[in-house]
Swiss-Prot record:
EC number: 2.3.1.-
GO CC terms of this entry: cytoplasm
Transmembrane segments: none
N-acetyltransferase domain span: 9-173
The organism of origin for this protein: Bacillus licheniformis
Gene assigned in the entry: p20
EC class name: transferase
CDD domains xref list: NAT_SF
Lineage: Bacteria, Bacillati, Bacillota, Bacilli, Bacillales
Protein name (database record): Uncharacterized N-acetyltransferase p20
SUPFAM superfamilies: Acyl-CoA N-acyltransferases (Nat) (SSF55729)
PANTHER family noted in UniProt: GNAT FAMILY, PUTATIVE (AFU_ORTHOLOGUE AFUA_3G00765)-RELATED-RELATED, RIBOSOMAL-PROTEIN-ALANINE ACETYLTRANSFERASE
Length: 178
């Protein structure tokens, strides 16, 4: 997995040394509100998550980058592909930031770079995002990056013990301006 760079950010493979700071973010109910995890209570949960995703990355099934601010070398969140379907050239995108980093354009900058990586390096044809209807910030982000809302998937998946509706968004390689 290569390291990616934007004007303000470095996106690199998640490492076990990121567990302490990621545990802080992933233990915040506001950060995990729309993630399919319950808030973490122990750093070992973050270590396990990092190891699981890195194992999936080795198999080409998923990947996740730590998002780092170049100026401060601070890990502020993660982004990546939760599921990669190489046979069909598609992947599901995911992203999260610590609450104190919201509203600064970091998610947009990181996800834009991730999209470029997906279409160029991973040779994807389609990038998908599943978003809960109440997750307005994520919907705004996807709209700003030219994702198309395809529709509502009713009772589509379990999150925190209950079936939820999700919007399906997608961006196709031929639509991507790059």
């Amino acid at each position: 997995m290569e390291t990616l760079y934007t004007e303000r950010l470095t996106l690199r493979k998640m490492e076990l040394e990121d567990a302490d700071v990621l545990c802080q973010y992933w233990s915040d109910p506001e950060v995990t509100k729309y993630m399919n995890i319950t808030p973490f209570t122990d750093v070992s949960q973050a270590r396990d998550m990092i190891q699981m995703i890195n194992d999936l990355s080795l198999e080409g099934q998923a990947n996740r980058f730590s998002i780092i601010v170049k100026e401060t070398d601070e890990v502020i969140g993660t982004c990546g592909f939760n599921m990669i379907d190489q046979e069909n050239g598609r992947a599901e995108i995911g992203y999260d930031l610590g609450r104190n980093h919201w509203g600064k354009g970091f998610a947009s900058e990181a996800v834009q770079k991730l999209i470029d990586y997906g279409f160029t390096s991973l040779n994807l044809n389609r990038i998908e995002a599943k978003v809960e209807p109440e997750n307005t910030p994520s919907i705004k982000l996807l709209n700003s990056l030219s994702f198309q809302k395809e529709g509502l998937l009713r009772d589509y998946e379990k999150a925190k013990g209950r079936l939820i509706d999700v919007y399906m968004f997608s961006l196709l390689k031929r639509e991507y301006a790059g």
